[in-house]
Amino acid sequence: MPPTSTSVEPGKASTAAQDKGSTVRLLLRAVLWVGGVLAAGVISLLMVVAIALAVAFPNLPDISDLSNYRPILPLRVLSSEGILIGEFGEERRNLTPIKQIPKVMIDAVLAIEDAEFYEHSGVSYKGFVRAALANLGRAKSQGASTITMQVARNVYLSSEKNYMRKIYEILLTFKLEHMLSKDQILEIYMNQIFLGNRAYGFSAASAAYFDKPLKEVTIAEAAMLAGLPKAPSAYNPISNPKRARSLQLHIIERMQENGFITPAQADMAKKQELKVKVGSDNTKVHAEYVAETVRQLMYA
């Protein structure tokens, strides 16, 4: 049988070529249009940021005083034996230099708040990406603030949430990182942060919740205290023990994941039964009249 050959009519071939060309042109137009919109969006965003920076930067507060950090401390009246008999002031705080803060307390805070604190320049771009991915499909957002950003916010800015305040926060963060060392920033954070029960800073919180100096806290106690910055009332081990316990266990796991503690230490910390202090009185001797007399003499 002789071979058969197929042929395409010239009109149909021309029509197919025209259709293909039209499709390609349509796709090119769509790509160019999308690219133009994205480019315009990026340019507009850069212009908005530039204007915001021009407005915000000259109005940034002077942070030179933080190089010699001296927070407000309560008036404490001690006996001749050094026993506390009276404390006056709205804020409980014990200023503790960074070198005197135990490593276990620092590790617990870094594990839950900012594990890359000593690596980033104030803003953790990895943290932003992780938070954005974690927030997809979640009703409740997950934050990405570094410790430096929290210092900038807690010391100088209001709690109001808007884009302008966020710009101020980021600018202040870079300014803090430029002027202060990492240890200085961490020292301010560890002493300044509110932790509930009128306690500011982890030294005061250790006394308020466990009735012991900060240098004596265990891994389990440090993990419990490290959960307080997120929400001091919600994770208060006195008023909300179940929620506090849940976060404490998570922090212990984070400490292990980041290499701060061994698996054996983590297991032991999870099993430790904490003795939480009930009551807000830190005085060992009740001599209120004497303490009040001293206060009046001091402010006379």
Tell where the protein language model's regions lie, with residue ranges:
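Non-catalytic, structured segments within soluble enzyme domains
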Residues: 138-300
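Short small-residue beta-strand/loop micro-motif enriched in glycine and branched aliphatics
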Residues: 85-87, 118, 233-236
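Flexible glycine-/small-residue-rich
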Residues: 77-79, 132, 227-229
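Terminal hydrophobic membrane-targeting helix
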Residues: 55-108
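Structural motif marking the loop-to-transmembrane transition
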Residues: 19-31, 35, 125, 144, ...
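Short, glycine-/polar-rich solvent-exposed loops and beta-turns at beta-strand/coil boundaries
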Residues: 68-69, 88-90, 121-127, 144-145, ...
